[in-house]
Amino acid sequence: DQGYENGYTDRILDTLKEKNVKTVFFVTGPYLEKNDRLIRRFVDEGHYVGNHTVRHKSMPLLSRAEAEKELLELEKAFEEKYNAQMLFFRPPMGEYNEETLKIAKELRYTTMFWSFAYDDWLKDKVRGPEYVVNLVSQNAHNGMIILFHAVSPDNAKALGSVIDTLRGMGYEFGDPIELYKP
């Protein structure tokens, strides 16, 4: 998730490129406005850019019109600037209801949740890359979708080892779109 930039995204992108792994970067409106160079790297290096809404508000608390505006405003700004589509939506904070899912589907989004996450958005809570590698590997499972926030120094340092460890356990990293094919 890319709510704001903390200086680790280039390292994350370098690791993903080195390990030949594609991912989805979920961005908000402020991130889109302030991080053109990084978003260009996302697109140019073959990653997906997902819709995390303009203002990162709890979707169930919004009216239908407000929820649609949150998605469509960001989508329009992204598509106009980068000539690419947003295919995935992740509800801010994971908060959603049936109406949220219905709106996203009507706007032709695939809603992507996660099957593993931890409190890595707390950027001052540093536990070291070994902690991340151990936590991910202990929770590894088929079809795993890992939610990492790019603001974490631990994630940036651990990513290469996480990929290597999971591959060593027999897991493969696929194109995110493949997870949603019928």
Language model segments and positions:
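Histidine-centered catalytic micro-motifs
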Residues: Y48-R55, G94, F148-V151
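Terminal accessory/targeting
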Residues: D14-T23, N142-P182
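A generic structural signal for well-ordered alpha-helical segments
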Residues: L16, F42, A104-L107, L166
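Alpha-helical scaffold elements lining the catalytic groove of polysaccharide deacetylases
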Residues: N6-R11, K57-Q85, E95-N142, N155-S161
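Active-site beta->alpha N-cap acidic-glycine motif
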Residues: D1-L62, E66-M86, E172, E178-K181
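Divalent metal-coordination and catalytic microenvironments
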Residues: D1, L16, V49, F89-P92, ...
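Short, solvent-exposed turn/loop segments enriched in Gly/Ser/Thr/Pro and often Arg
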Residues: T28, R90-N97
